[in-house]
Amino acid sequence: VFGEVHRVFGADAAGADHQRHELLTALCIGYETALRAGTALMATSPTYHASGGFSAIGVVCAGARLLDFDAATFRHALGIAEYFSARCPMMRVVLAPTMLRDAHGAGAFTGLNALLMAMEGVTGAPAETVEDASVAEHWNDLGQRWEIDSQYFKPWPVCRWAQPALTAMLELQRIDPGLTADAIETLRVETFYESMCLQGHTPQDADQAQYALAFPLAALIVRGRLGPDEVTGAAIHAADILALSRRIEVVEAADLSARFPGEILSRLTVTRKDGSQVVSPITAARGDPATALTALELEHKFDLFAARLGQEHAQAVKQAVRQLARAPSAIVALEPLFQASDRSVP
C-alpha cells in the first residue's frame, strides 16, 4: 500500500496539480466517509463507540481512491474493515482512562490491513454500516451535504465532553476578571451524563488527567491556560491545581442529558469566598461550527502543542502545510510532518 501511495504522490512536477488535488480529495473522502460510518454505527448500536470503531471505513475509502480499486475490490475492503474493526466502547475509557484512548491507531491499522487483504483477493463484503437499508439515510446525501462541516476543533487537549465547562469558565472570567482561583470557594458543574462520568478530581497519570473534567477545569483556572504542560508531568500532582479540583462538584443535569448527543452542553455555578454566586448560561463548546476558532487561534494552538518539537521543526511543519499548493511533490513537501523530533519528551 505505501509503495503504491508513494507512486501516486511521488510524481514529477508535471503531475503536481493532479497529485495535490488527489491528496486533498483522499483526505476529504477519508474524513467524510469515516464520519458517516460513525453516525451509522451509533444509530444501530446501543454502545457509544470511540472513533477507532469506525475510522477504518474512512481509511479504506481514501485508500481505494488512491489505489484505483475496482468496485468489487473496494466493496470487499469495506467489509473486511468493518468486520475487523475494534469494538471501542467509549465509556469504558471514560470511566477507567488508559492509553487506549479513542483507538485511532487500531482504526488506521484495520483500514490498511483491509486494503492489503482486498488487494490479495480476500473477500469480505458486505459492510452492513454502509450497505444495509437501515442506515441508508446516513449515506443517501453523500456529495450533497458534508459531515465535515459539522465537525469541531478542540481548543484544549482534554476530552471533548469537558470542553463546554471550560468554555463557560473562560466566559465568566471574561465578564469578571476577578474570578480567580483565590476568589473561588466552590464550583458546581452541571452537565450531561456522559460528561458527568469524567469526574477526575485527582488524576494519577496523564490519561486520567485528560479524560477528566474537574482537574482540567481547575488547571485552566489556576494556571490561566490549558495546554499539554497542564495535563502531563508534574502538573498532575500540583498542589494548587489539586486544591481547587477537590472543590469542584460535577453533577448530571437532566435537561442537558436530554439534548445529548445532538448538543454537548454545560453550565457552571461559581461560589465566591464572600458567599456570592455567579451562574453561567447553558454553554456549548468553543470550537464548534457555531463558535468556530479563528485561523489565528488554530495557529496558536499548534504553536502551543508543537513546542516540544522545537521552534525550527515546528515552523517547518507549518511552512510545509502552507506551501503544499505550490509544491512540486506532495510527499516531499510534507516530509517535516513525518520527521521524528530530536528533542526528548519528559
Which ranges hold each PLM region?
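Alpha-helical support elements that line or immediately flank enzyme active sites
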Residues: V1-E22, S55-F69, C159-P177, I221, ...
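Glycine-rich, mobile lid/loop segments that gate access to catalytic sites or pores
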Residues: R7-G107, N113
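Terminal-appendage/accessory-domain detector
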Residues: R92, A96-F109, L116-P346
